[in-house]
């Protein structure tokens, strides 16, 4: 319902405007309370980069985190990642993800990052606690925060904002009348605006990132096959914008028998998923969904492995920005407050 109000012409947003104004006042007061030193901002001895967004929902933050982690690892830097661990529930924070961790505790996106990259990932609602936990565990050159643009208690050196190149900012209103966590003018203060999707809708000065499916992977066995390997597919997606996943499958020649959408961060059960397919049908999902199903996966369950592609010039510029900050920290005598 909210998507129709936010991203399509609908007068219903007018009824929600008073609540949006209240949200805007609270959001603004929260930000300036840190900017003017009324509340403590936590700083650390390594650079922090935030990869976040201005709107609610999935715009591609986690794929961009994966892209950056993998590039920095290849260049020899020691990288850590922190996350709020949205929808994860635990009695003990911070959590440093390990072989015994479950997505129900730490969240699906942190688990995906850990499984895909192997770097240290810490989860806590208080991101400064997650940073401190990582630095106690090992020496790092940089820490990347998956989301957290509005978490001003954590000092950040670099901010990248991910934008859906098609949906953009909808009607531009604060929550709940619109999708905005902060106003669009916040983009003037970030170091990079990265548009996820197609060149259609991209604005001047923005970096284009595109997600390409590389292979399908069996959740139970880890077997990898080319995209065209699967037939009789039932596709599911519990992400911010499931239709984008289904559209991508069709564009690569995978035409699902059925396409089933779930809410973002949906919690699956074995009984629920087995009921979705008949004999000789394949259940195909996103990698983010797959990390929640590993413990009870069946041999006909597969996920799509995707990778971010960014052109060489923008890749060079983004990595130079980050590496220059790492070198600055290594060359300075930085005092932790």
Curated annotation (Swiss-Prot):
Protein name as annotated: Tetraacyldisaccharide 4'-kinase
Family listed: Belongs to the LpxK family.
Lineage: Bacteria, Pseudomonadati, Pseudomonadota, Gammaproteobacteria, Enterobacterales
Keywords: ATP-binding, Kinase, Lipid A biosynthesis, Lipid biosynthesis, Lipid metabolism, Nucleotide-binding, Transferase
Enzymatic reactions: a lipid A disaccharide + ATP = a lipid IVA + ADP + H(+)
Keyword match Endoplasmic reticulum: no
Gene name tied to this protein: lpxK
Segments passing through the bilayer: none
GO CC terms, sorted: plasma membrane
Positions with a binding annotation for ATP: 55-62
GO MF term set: ATP binding; tetraacyldisaccharide 4'-kinase activity
SUPFAM superfamilies xrefs: P-loop containing nucleoside triphosphate hydrolases
Role this protein plays: Transfers the gamma-phosphate of ATP to the 4'-position of a tetraacyldisaccharide 1-phosphate intermediate (termed DS-1-P) to form tetraacyldisaccharide 1,4'-bis-phosphate (lipid IVA).
Entry keyword Kinase: yes
BP GO annotations: lipid A biosynthetic process; lipopolysaccharide core region biosynthetic process
Entries under InterPro entries matching the protein: LpxK, P-loop_NTPase
Source organism superkingdom: Bacteria
UniProt EC number: 2.7.1.130
Pathway(s) annotated for this protein in UniProt: Glycolipid biosynthesis; lipid IV(A) biosynthesis; lipid IV(A) from (3R)-3-hydroxytetradecanoyl-[acyl-carrier-protein] and UDP-N-acetyl-alpha-D-glucosamine: step 6/6
């Amino acid at each position: 319902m909210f998507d129709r109000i936010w991203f399509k012409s609908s007068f219903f947003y007018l009824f929600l405007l008073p609540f949006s104004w209240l949200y805007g006042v609270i959001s603004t007061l929260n930000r300036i309370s840190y900017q003017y030193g009324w509340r403590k901002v936590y700083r650390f001895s390594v650079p922090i980069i935030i990869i976040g967004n201005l709107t609610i929902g999935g715009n591609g933050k986690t794929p961009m985190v994966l892209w950056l982690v993998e590039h920095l690892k290849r260049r020899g830097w020691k990288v850590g990642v922190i996350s709020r661990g949205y929808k994860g529930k635990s009695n003990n924070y911070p959590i440093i993800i390990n072989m015994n961790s479950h997505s129900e505790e730490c969240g699906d996106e942190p688990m995906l990052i850990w499984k895909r990259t192997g770097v240290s990932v810490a989860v806590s609602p208080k991101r400064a606690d997650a940073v401190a936990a990582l630095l106690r565990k090992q020496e790092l050159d940089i820490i990347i925060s998956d989301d957290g643009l509005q978490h001003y208690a954590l000092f950040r050196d670099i901010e990248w904002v991910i934008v859906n190149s098609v949906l953009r900012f909808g009607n531009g209103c604060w929550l709940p009348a619109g999708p905005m966590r902060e106003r669009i003018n916040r983009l003037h203060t970030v170091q990079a605006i990265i548009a996820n999707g197609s060149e259609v809708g991209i604005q001047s000065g923005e970096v284009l990132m595109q997600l390409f499916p590389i292979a399908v992977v069996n959740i139970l066995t880890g077997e990898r096959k080319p995209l065209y390997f699967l037939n009789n597919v039932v596709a599911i997606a519990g992400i911010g914008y499931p239709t984008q996943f289904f559209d991508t499958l069709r564009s690569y020649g995978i035409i699902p028998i059925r396409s089933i959408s779930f809410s973002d961060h949906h919690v699956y059960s074995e009984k629920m998923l087995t009921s979705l397919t008949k004999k000789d049908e394949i259940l195909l999902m996103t990698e983010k969904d797959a990390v929640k199903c590993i413990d009870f996966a069946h041999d006909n369950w597969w996920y799509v492995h995707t990778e971010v592609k960014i052109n060489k010039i923008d890749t060079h510029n983004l990595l130079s920005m980050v590496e220059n900050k790492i070198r600055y920290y290594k060359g300075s005598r930085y005092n932790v407050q």
